[in-house]
């Protein structure tokens, strides 16, 4: 049976799965029904979820949020800690929004990996999303959701590059282009509609930026002042909008590669155009006040959610070890012609290089003297990279890598230099690899056009020209990431790596 002939995931199909008693693992099946092909171990959402109120407005509808936040929301609702459902907002209507409509917001989450050295697989139909909206064409509906008293949480994942003011945004745009402008407008509407009474709301950003909630709060304040919004509104922002600093940790690969998608549908017994694959491991750390704790999933639903007084040690380990090594693996791996994280980490030379970068440069720079915990986490990370069940594309990891260099590598470089007094050569090789990737490969990056204009002015035979380019791009990466770095100390080493790679090749330079 081809995928096109399978029944599509929808509310009616979900009702049919319940009829077959799948949640109770009932053996009663009707063989002539196409649902008889569905496996009996799919975890179904409880019926109370489908009637739950919409309480969470989510800016972003990508695979990560669907494989992470929505999973925690469903677990909380099932566990009797109801937090409501999600209204998902994406920038414009496309094939994904059409699939959301066609599938009644439902999709399958497949978790595959190793736990205690043994393979595990879990399949869940996620019903956390009630509907999907387009910001470009349905902004009035997004605004209506923002002003509802029942809306208590706004979640976002616009990537690091999205946390920047839109230079041309105005308070009357429908909608503003930049995310801070969108959020400021939504919060202003909520404040105006309620006259500031009983309108408290939590903002839970999932971007991989240090103190992301605090940063977003400052951006909203800055945007409001730029728009000359009232002092009363600014006071309300400070008193009634509860920003959480967060750390998110789960490898979400997204949809299976096209050559494997048909087999997944056959195994499920139905067609799902929104299927998400991820690892079982999930950690969501929040540094937030009591309001966020009351209205967002907490540890009652899953041990993967932790509310803490200080998430710094979690963030340092995760961003510098997992995300930093991802950035290095992605850039070098793609330059070597590799396709997935597992291929990259299993490449003997590259795997050894990344392991050495973590153990000899990142962990020694770990603050607060928790090197043993960092070493344990690093071993877990490398094992997760080798997950045989996850096809984590290097292309997706490398998106917006020009900004990720600053947020993921600069802190470790800065800390290493402070503690050791020398530059971390492997991390700087990773910086050089990202620069080269942005010149030579097809990369989805907000700043790609500018960077390629900068590359076009480089004389490859001139060390001075290469150094000037490196200094210029590093300065831009400091600006984009808001992460300070000693440019004069690291630029010569990065430029030298670029020259050597051109003369000797990538592998020979990596070995030197």
Q: Could you describe each region identified by the protein language model?
A:
Residues 2-512:
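Substrate/ligand-engaging "lid" and interaction regions
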